[in-house]
Amino acid sequence: MLDAISAEALKFKRHRATWGLVWIWPIGLTLIWLIAIAVELSGVGGEAGGDGRGGLTAAGWIADNVGFWGVPGDTFGRYIIGAFVAVVFAGEYGWNTWKLIVPHRARTSLIAAKYAIAFILLAIGFTLAALLFNLFGWLTDVITGDSIPAGITAGALLKAHGAGALAALPAVLLTIAYVSLAAILTRSTVAALVIGLVVTTIEQLFRTFAPMIEPSAPSLVGALYEVLPGYHVANVASFATEGRVLEIPFPSGTFSTSLGTSLAITGAWIVALVGLTFWSFRRQDIN
């Protein structure tokens, strides 16, 4: 298993897909900040001297500066995650390398290694980007002269980063599960990406618009809202960042569930999709 993970790490840590879809977050943030601060200091964007954040409380400043953790769970962020996962899982088919690897290693360990390296690289990329986002927020205030609120501690920052990471985790894992299964079933990077984009978009759209369409089929819409993962992913994120249940107003009444229920349903979807991926690959004819 460790050999398989090492092989995947060697393959993907410098792969173009990793540079373009994982390392792009910290690199892109750095470039954007450098451009923004240059514009600010040059006075091109208006009079320099602060961005108006001086009146923030410590809690507000921390919330602003750990805000990058909203990106992995956002629709666009999930699209980028899906693109990377599609390359990791379907790339072997396009490169015709499975037939060279499969006879020498257990198929279960091969897929497990892909899950491990995809998650590890994404975790490193997003964590580095989130920490840089925090650092750049502080540097911006220092350079522009905005006051930094008193009472900000390392412990409070770490707690906020941890909550943000936990809030993003279900969406990231679910996206990995969607796209990995599509990659194994279709054997195509493009098809896996398209399926991942479509499923993620439908998930988000249904969560948003279900209250509007409920009157046309109340029982069906209500049942789907309870069992599909969209609401439950958002509910876990709400608990992680705000400490409260996510309440969705429907014409028939407010919909909400407990954290335990949302964790169970989200976990069941992830386990089922990942399990299907392992099962499908073990039965697949590799030519």
Q: Which ranges hold each PLM region?
A:
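Helix-capping/transition residues at the boundaries of transmembrane alpha-helices
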Residues: K11, A90, V102, V179, ...
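Secretory targeting signals
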Residues: T18, P26-V87, A112, A116-T186, ...
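Aromatic- and glycine-rich beta-strand/loop motifs that create alpha-glucan
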Residues: M1-P26
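Junction motif at the cytosolic side of a transmembrane helix
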Residues: A264-N287
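Transmembrane alpha-helical core residues of multi-pass small-molecule transporters
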Residues: I24-G28, I117, A129, G196-E203, ...
